[in-house]
């Protein structure tokens, strides 16, 4: 998140004006790379075009199994003779010319649901990350000549209609170096995408966000890597391409001023229904500094000595190891001293003799 309270407005000639704009509250939103990646993966799936293989692919031949008893697999085989194809296996996914396993269908569930508030949270997080210079540089953007981030240009930029004039503005504000990087990055794609309309790959350049389109979209649409978007229709696919935070964004003054009305602030309600701008749970993210502060350490009891837990327990037989036996049964020592185990058990019932039994019968 950015901590500067004021942002300067740059003219289309690259001059820093006297006007200062307060930093919108959305730039104080938490930067959540985990949330941005999760939302991006799901949102990016929603623009896929349905595809499937032909229903009869791999089955356009007459083949039957030979059955058992011929010392070959029971896979269906092409009949006939006079050609190499006869006798070859068919239909199975392991066969040459056979169908694929689980043929793809157009009724696959292509669309993935994303919670509305989760999408808005990720968008706000991506906007906040665009003001952090380290994240913008880490993403690969060339912003060494940019005076400050976020970069705000006067509203005259929205009225530019010629591409050469738009490029001149980019050079004046120090953003053209990023366009040159895009031009040099154009390479032939590896793989079959070359045959499917995706012949080249190139990096992403700056994103220009405007409030009103007075010709800026047509002026910039042919500049390599440069994209345009309305401040009211910002999406995560443009703010964080590839789920990587830190897109280089050029704001027009009108778009920058309307961020508080679009996403809300402490004093302004968002135009998005039922939306509240996310905020940090703690203002200082340096938890180590908080824990080691004098105020916290004054009420925290001192840490005890470190105890190392035994990695494993040595198992011994208590019947053979006397020390282990005494640990399990402390009475075993007295039991052995009294020789209780070797003493004979007293007879509970004495068997009468024959004489005693005869006297009982007489009585």
Swiss-Prot record:
Keywords: Cytoplasm, Ribonucleoprotein, Ribosomal protein. One of its GO terms (molecular function) is RNA binding. Disulfide bonds: none annotated. Its main location: cytoplasm. InterPro entries: Ribos_uL4_C_dom, Ribosomal_uL4, Ribosomal_uL4_dom_sf, Ribosomal_uL4_euk/arc_CS, Ribosomal_uL4_euk/arch. It is found in: Cytoplasm. GO terms for biological process: translation. GO terms for cellular component: cell surface; cytosolic large ribosomal subunit; membrane. Component of the large ribosomal subunit. Mature ribosomes consist of a small (40S) and a large (60S) subunit. The 40S subunit contains about 32 different proteins and 1 molecule of RNA (18S). The 60S subunit contains 45 different proteins and 3 molecules of RNA (25S, 5.8S and 5S). Component of the ribosome, a large ribonucleoprotein complex responsible for the synthesis of proteins in the cell. The small ribosomal subunit (SSU) binds messenger RNAs (mRNAs) and translates the encoded message by selecting cognate aminoacyl-transfer RNA (tRNA) molecules. The large subunit (LSU) contains the ribosomal catalytic site termed the peptidyl transferase center (PTC), which catalyzes the formation of peptide bonds, thereby polymerizing the amino acids delivered by tRNAs into a polypeptide chain. Belongs to the universal ribosomal protein uL4 family. PANTHER family: 60S RIBOSOMAL PROTEIN L4 (PTHR19431). This is Large ribosomal subunit protein uL4. The lineage of its organism: Eukaryota, Fungi, Dikarya, Ascomycota, Saccharomycotina.
């Amino acid at each position: 998140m950015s901590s500067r309270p004021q942002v300067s407005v740059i003219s289309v000639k690259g001059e820093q004006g006297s006007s200062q704009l307060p930093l919108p509250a959305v730039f104080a939103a938490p930067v959540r790379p985990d949330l941005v990646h999760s939302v991006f993966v799901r949102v990016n799936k929603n623009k896929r075009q349905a595809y499937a293989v032909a229903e009869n692919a791999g089955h356009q031949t007459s083949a039957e199994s030979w059955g058992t008893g011929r010392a070959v697999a029971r896979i269906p085989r092409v009949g006939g003779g006079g050609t190499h194809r006869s006798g070859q296996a068919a239909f199975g996914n392991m066969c040459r010319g056979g169908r694929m396993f689980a043929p793809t269908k157009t009724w696959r569930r292509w669309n993935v649901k994303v919670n509305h508030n989760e999408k808005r949270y990720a968008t706000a997080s991506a906007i906040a990350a665009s003001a952090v210079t380290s994240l913008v540089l880490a993403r690969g953007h060339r912003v060494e000549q940019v005076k400050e981030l976020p970069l705000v240009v006067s509203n005259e930029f929205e009225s530019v209609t010629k591409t050469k004039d738009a490029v001149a503005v980019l050079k004046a504000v120090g953003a053209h170096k990023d366009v040159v990087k895009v031009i040099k990055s154009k390479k032939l794609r590896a793989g079959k995408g070359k045959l499917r309309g995706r012949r080249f790959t190139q990096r992403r350049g700056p994103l220009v966000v405007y409030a009103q389109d007075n010709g800026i979209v047509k002026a910039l649409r042919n500049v390599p890597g440069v994209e345009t978007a309305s401040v009211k229709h910002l999406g995560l696919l443009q703010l964080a391409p590839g789920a990587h935070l830190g897109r280089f964004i050029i704001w027009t003054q009108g778009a920058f001023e309307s961020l508080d009305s679009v996403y809300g602030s402490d004093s302004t309600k968002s135009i998005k229904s039922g939306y509240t701008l996310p905020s940090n749970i703690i203002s200082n993210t340096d938890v180590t500094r908080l824990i080691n502060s004098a105020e916290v350490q004054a009420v925290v009891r001192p840490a005890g000595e470190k105890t190392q837990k035994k990695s494993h327990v040595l198992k011994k037989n208590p019947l053979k190891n006397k020390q282990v036996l005494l640990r399990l049964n402390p009475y075993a020592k007295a039991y052995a001293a009294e020789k209780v185990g070797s003493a004979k058990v007293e007879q509970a019932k004495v068997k009468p003799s024959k004489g005693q039994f005869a006297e009982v019968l007489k009585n």
